[in-house]
Design a protein with these regions (language model features):
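Short aromatic-centered micro-motifs
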Residues: 31, 43, 73, 180, ...
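Glycine-rich, aromatic-lined ligand/substrate-binding cores of catalytic
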Residues: 833-865
Length: 983
């Protein structure tokens, strides 16, 4: 008993002794390179949650330390260090900068460059910064994330693409799309049927986007890069010593309708027709109150499953991924099912002198297209039922007294969906084989060969039911049409790179020279079967264009402070005729100064980066719609338009094709953009605050434009070089990490872009009274104009007159030239589609295993032409005596009955489309070592997209890339719930 008592007393004595044995340790954390203190360093006892962080002066105090504890010091951009506590009360730590971080490379044209050696305006968005909740379209990943770049959805259909603009584009009528390169292969626009040529890339396979904005960065790609370049790099396998890495990412998405067009309901419609219509029209009214938009719209469900396997050793690694997407549309019957497969294999031989990289990406998109739209639902009589006994599938249709369909009458939108089967099967594959060899006898010299391909085929079919009103004139058979298209894109790139570090001069020389060849081919067949099973077959096979280029680039880096870059490219195209017009040059030059490496800033504890950049470059453009606009051509007729010249002895008719001489312009030449850029990259407090400032000016000459031809010409229009255009802007970006501890990290980021475009010269005509060129026509009128001194696509409109109550007076416009006549001479330039400035900002909060993010986006100064409301008038309802059509509730405000064609050109319909959107909110939780299995992590997440929009615009969505709102496919609000599993 005495022994037990003594033992118990001894144990009780040990408990407080062990408590008092815990100690505190303090010290200072500095940068080993310059001796400056580092604030915000994470200091933690490994295996515990006991930790602290260094203060602004690098000082720290860590309590509760026991002998043998391992203390870890870590900070972004530095190599972590560990110390075993042995009783000392002070530990001072000098962290070394992470060489891998210092040597971080950025993918640019034909190679890569150390981030610190960049001289151009280049932005990289990595997977950590992607927008959340994206299923089908990769371009959505970077929407609003980069200054100077706009990404506007073309609509909300499954797999819908976007209109991407870098610094506002450079052209009026030629392409303004950036060049998109995936793992070294420039993409070609897809064939008909596909909604987005990026859909062959699974968003889950993307590692990063690199955006090249100024001409010094893009000129190496020549004329294809006049509107900027987006380089997509996909994920690769890593060296895991043969261990297999598995990832599964799956989610389910629920989509709902955010808004609808405000159409007259059944009661409002009956009231209007009763008050204003004839007795025959009143007799047409039904008794229903049908919301036709509700009849064709639905809430949708989508699923997305992605699996990837990767592994590797020092000499070989690989990654294989499979994606399965099933996405319903908001319009009934609209559906996309996509299967994607991606494979990457990287090998190294001969002591890393030979590297071979193989990429293959394949996707099959199976579309079921909705065969009606919101506009059709808007215009159908809301007093009629969906169904009615008749010979047209028992859907209500406008019929005459004999039960026949009335010509030109609107079709029941539900019947248009159900009685049409429209499908598309898109196959797309792209890949490349890249061989990189570093010469043994001269290791500074590398040869790189890149052979790539892109093949896209589309088969689209449409079957219209025999009892559809669309087949009313046919003989009881279904109508059928099919289109087969194929596009091929073949690439051959070769370059030599020589990089020499001359230590005696503290200078690095980097020189690249190479050759590029790309060929495009279109082929296909159009087939239709309709009246009495007559079959029409129309094959085609057209070489589209061939592109040749020789390029070179030289970079000199002196003491990591002064970097000079120059590039030159010589290109040829088959679009233009004559050697003088077929060839063009793309020179560029740039200089950057890493001021933070100067002695007067090297020891600064405030400034961690300060880089000044200046650049100049020229990039041409040739992507006008016609593939051969400079060559004389004859258009031969299709089989339906052949001319019979006689017959064979057996009576078989003999046909020959007719021909039409097409207009051409042998003097057509390159559109050329010269760009100037001044930039600043900065970082403060060891990168806790960072950002960039860029000022740019783009001057485009010899604008390519499809312009109207004089009367008597063989065609109404032809391609010409007609004038000059300028675009200038200011881009600002800022990223701040206000809090960074072991358990809590808060990041704030944002960007804003101010932009201004102006047509500076039009020289296609010699007429001082010439108003300008038009490129958006409707109902015999025009709304967008290109004219000197104003922004591209400015609105050309009448000035509406209003009464004392602010109600527009029908057909009344200001006589601006005071000649007592209202005609086109009274129109004026009013507003523009492009924003004065646009912005995006986000916040990310990580607390232990929780992750929260929120992203906002907006624009100011952009105006839309609301063509939906412009068509709202009483005559639209009462135009015929045997049918009725609906319109929007704007009729109740304007009370317009007709107003003539001039109504469409009223500034009443030019509306402020500025907006602020809460694009997405995401919340996730990660289970580390899930179910106590080591190296298995599971993340559960939820994301809401298209959360909130604040705008004065009266349409269903203010984001219209062209500014011309003629109803779009509604963009849904989505709720996504998913799981990500790694082991």
């Amino acid at each position: 008993m005495k022994t037990f008592t003594k033992s118990a007393l001894f144990l009780l004595w040990l408990i407080p002794m062990s408590f008092f044995a815990q100690s505190s340790v303090s010290g200072t954390v500095t940068d080993a390179g310059n001796g400056q203190p580092i604030p915000g360093v994470n200091i933690i006892i490994k295996g515990t949650t006991n930790g602290t962080s260094s203060d602004f002066d690098g000082n720290y105090v860590l309590n509760g330390v026991n002998n043998g504890d391992i203390i870890e010091f870590s900070y972004v951009g530095f190599i972590a260090q560990e110390f075993t506590y042995s009783g000392t009360s002070r530990i001072d730590v000098a962290l070394q900068e992470d060489a891998a971080e210092l040597e971080q490379v950025v993918v640019i044209g034909y190679g890569s460059v150390r981030k610190k050696d960049l001289t151009g305006s280049v932005t990289t968005v990595t997977a950590d910064d992607f927008n959340q909740g994206v299923n089908a379209s990769p371009d959505q990943l970077i929407k609003g994330r980069t200054a100077g770049v706009t990404v506007i959805d073309n609509g909300g259909a499954p797999g819908e693409g976007s209109t991407i603009r870098i610094r506002g584009g450079s052209s009026l009528n030629a392409s303004n799309n950036p060049l998109i390169i995936v793992d070294g292969v420039p993409l070609d626009p897809g064939p008909g049927g596909t909604r987005n040529n990026l859909n062959s890339i699974n968003p889950n396979d993307i590692e990063s986007f690199t955006v090249l904005k100024d001409a010094s960065a893009t000129a190496i790609y020549g004329f294809r890069a006049s509107n900027g370049v987006i380089i997509i790099t996909t994920k690769k396998g890593l060296n895991t010593d043969g261990k297999l890495k598995f990832n599964y990412n799956g989610n389910v998405t629920f989509s709902e309708i955010v808004d609808k067009i405000e159409a007259l309901d059944g009661n409002q419609f009956r009231e209007y027709v009763t008050a204003n219509g004839s007795q025959a029209q009143i007799d047409l009214l039904g008794t229903e109150n049908t919301d036709w938009q509700d009849e064709i719209l639905q809430n949708a469900v989508s699923t997305n499953h992605n699996i990837s396997l990767s592994s590797g050793w020092d000499w070989i690694n690989y990654r294989v991924s499979l994606g399965l997407l099933s996405e319903e549309g908001l319009i009934k019957t609209d559906q996309l099912d996509r299967t994607s497969l991606s494979t990457n294999i990287r090998t190294k031989f001969f002591d890393n002198h030979l590297r071979i990289n193989t990429n293959i990406k394949t996707a099959i998109e199976d579309y079921t297209y909705a065969t009606t739209n919101i506009g059709a639902a808007l215009g159908f009589d809301p007093t009629q039922p969906v169904f009615q006994d008749n010979n047209f599938g028992n859907y209500f249709q406008w019929l005459d007294g004999s039960g026949n369909a009335i010509a030109l009458a609107g079709q029941n939108p539900v019947a248009a969906l159900e009685q049409n089967d429209s499908r598309g099967l898109i196959f797309r594959s792209l890949g490349n084989l890249e061989v990189d060899y570093k010469f043994h006898f001269l290791p500074e010299l590398r040869a790189n060969l890149n052979v790539g391909y892109e093949i896209a085929s589309a088969k689209t079919e449409n079957i219209t039911s025999a009892n559809s009103v669309a087949n009313a004139a046919r003989t009881g058979n279904d109508s059928f049409s099919r289109s087969d298209q194929k596009r091929e894109n073949l690439l051959f790139d070769f370059y030599l790179n020589y990089r020499k570090d001359v230590e005696s001069l503290n200078t690095v020389f980097d020189v690249t020279a190479g050759y590029s060849y790309q060929k495009f081919l279109d082929s296909g067949n159009n087939f239709s079967r309709g009246f009495d099973l007559v079959e029409i077959d129309n094959p085609f096979n057209n070489p589209r264009e061939v592109l040749l280029g020789f390029f070179g680039r030289a970079t000199i880096s002196i003491a990591d402070k002064y970097i000079f870059t120059g590039s030159f490219r010589r290109d040829a195209t088959s679009r233009f005729s004559g050697l003088e017009n077929q060839w063009t040059s793309s020179p560029s030059g740039a200089f950057s100064w890493n001021a933070h490496n100067e002695n007067f800033l090297k020891d600064s504890n405030l400034i961690s980066q300060l880089k000044f950049r200046v650049s100049y470059g020229v990039t041409p453009q040739q992507s006008i719609g016609d593939a051969t606009p400079s060559l004389p051509r004859i258009l031969t007729s299709d089989p339906q338009s052949q001319y019979q010249i006689g017959q064979e002895p057996d009576g078989t008719p003999i046909f020959i094709s007719t021909g039409l001489a097409l207009p051409y312009n042998p003097d057509l030449t390159w559109e050329t953009t010269t760009q100037y850029n001044i930039g600043l990259d900065y970082g403060l407090f060891d990168g806790r605050v960072s950002g960039s400032i860029d000022v740019y000016r783009k001057e485009t000459e010899d604008l390519l434009f499809l312009a109207a031809l004089p009367s008597g010409s063989l065609s109404n229009e032809d391609d010409v070089n007609l004038g000059n255009l300028t675009n200038e802007g200011l881009e600002l970006s800022l990223n701040v990490t206000p809090i960074q501890t072991e358990n809590l990290r808060w990041q704030i980021g944002g960007n804003i872009t101010f932009q201004k475009g102006e047509v500076t010269e039009l020289f296609a005509v010699d007429n001082p009274n010439f108003e300008g060129f038009f490129n958006t026509g409707f109902v015999g009128s025009n709304i967008n104009i290109q004219t000197v001194g104003f922004a591209p696509n400015s609105y050309w409109v009448f000035e509406q007159i209003y009464d004392a109550n602010g109600v527009p007076v029908e057909g009344a416009y200001v006589d601006r030239n005071n000649d007592n006549i209202i005609n086109e001479k009274d129109k004026y330039i009013y507003r523009k589609p492009a924003a004065d400035f646009f912005y995006g900002f986000n916040t990310i909060l990580d607390y232990k295993n929780w992750n929260f993010s929120m992203f906002w986006r907006g624009s100011v100064g952009n105006y839309n032409y609301n063509f939906v409301d412009a068509g709202s008038n009483g005559r639209r309802i009462l135009n015929f005596q045997n049918t009725l059509s609906n319109t929007t509730t704007d009729l109740l405000q304007s009370n317009f009955f007709d107003g003539g064609v001039d109504r469409f050109s009223s500034d009443y319909y030019i509306q402020d489309a500025s907006f602020l959107k809460l694009d997405n909110i995401s919340l996730g939780y990660t289970f580390k070592n899930f179910l106590n299995y080591k190296n298995i992590d599971m993340k559960l997440y939820g994301t809401v997209n298209n959360v909130l929009i604040i705008t004065d615009y009266t349409g269903i969505d203010p984001e219209i890339s062209s500014g011309f709102d003629s109803t779009i496919y509604p963009r849904p609000r989505t709720y996504q719930f998913g799981v990500n599993l790694d082991f």
